[in-house]
């Protein structure tokens, strides 16, 4: 639970990007993650002609977007007239007269701000997609463990905790936490470059 109340009044960025929901009217997009999913959701909604107000607790929109993609996204946002609010957290949501009231909070000034919208989309990253990892772990030679010292010293992973193990298994990328593609590829490369 990322905010006080009104969780049932919002949808996730993935609900939007996978077309599980169709939104119209004024949309508040709250992006606590600052990565591609939030910016991509804003672009997707703008392409559909929606009126989007993007809010983030960070000092800038898309704080984890790289320098190549950032200018293109911001240009699109400005050209579309998208409203952007930084340094504000989503505190709560409530329904009133058929609309949703989003209560925001600025940590810098300790002041609240309320926005009235038709829909709220929240991007908080993802929980680890670790079900396959845990299912396979018991049959792995290393029981899913990574030798951190060997990893740091660029040595092969040789842990053998299961003599009946059939393979080595390592937990990287979204199996650990919300990651972008570059981070997951970097983790895989670092781990596998000495095999």
Positions of the model-derived regions?
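Residues that act as N-cap/strand-start positions at coil-to-secondary-structure junctions
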Residues: 78, 87, 107-109
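Helical element adjacent to the flavin cofactor pocket in flavoenzyme catalytic cores
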Residues: 73-84
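Short beta-strand segments that buttress and anchor functional surface loops
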Residues: 103-105
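Rossmann-like dinucleotide/flavin-binding elements
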Residues: 1-67, 107-119, 123-195
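A conserved short coil-to-beta-strand element within the FAD-binding core of flavoproteins
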Residues: 1, 86-101
